[in-house]
């Protein structure tokens, strides 16, 4: 959970960084999609972490690498693809198998795919 929570909380900041720097063809739709992502992800992750901590105790967030400053749409889409792969792997943790935790993770995956859809198709 520590790695998953850290990655997702960092993704909010990364999406905000992409949001303020995106330009070119498709920038307006990307700008809006990224804003929706960073406005939404924090609340979902907060609920997931609080539920987990209610069951297992407090977690310690892990270090995450710095911000990606490449604001090209293709790079932003690749970033979300990497997040989807990471979440798919990290959600397999034995302590995350309770249905209420998996439901929150499902909501995170839904948000990731919605954001990717908007980045790819609404240019």
Please give the residue ranges for each predicted region:
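Acidic side chains
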Residues: 16, 46, 104-106
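Acidic/histidine-rich alpha-helical segments that form the ligand environment
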Residues: 64-119
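Disorder-to-helix initiation segments
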Residues: 1-11, 69-76
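Short amphipathic alpha-helical segments with heptad-repeat character
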Residues: 2-5, 9, 35, 42, ...
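Long, well-ordered alpha-helical segments
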Residues: 4-22, 48-51, 83-90, 112-122
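Helix-loop segments that flank and shape redox-cofactor active sites
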Residues: 11-36, 58, 93-98
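Conserved alpha-helical segments that form or flank metal/cofactor-binding pockets of metalloenzymes
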Residues: 29-60
């Amino acid at each position: 959970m520590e790695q998953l929570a850290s990655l997702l909380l960092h993704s909010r900041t990364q999406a905000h960084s992409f949001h303020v720097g995106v330009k070119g063809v498709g920038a307006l739709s990307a700008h809006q999609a990224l804003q929706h992502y960073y406005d939404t992800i924090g609340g979902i992750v907060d609920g997931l972490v609080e539920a987990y901590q209610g069951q297992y105790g407090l977690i310690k967030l892990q270090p995450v690498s710095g911000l990606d400053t490449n604001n090209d749409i293709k790079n932003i889409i690749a970033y979300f693809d990497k997040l989807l792969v990471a979440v798919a792997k990290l959600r397999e943790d034995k302590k995350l198998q309770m249905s209420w935790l998996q439901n929150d993770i499902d909501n995170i995956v839904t948000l990731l795919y919605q954001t990717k859809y908007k980045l790819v198709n609404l240019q």
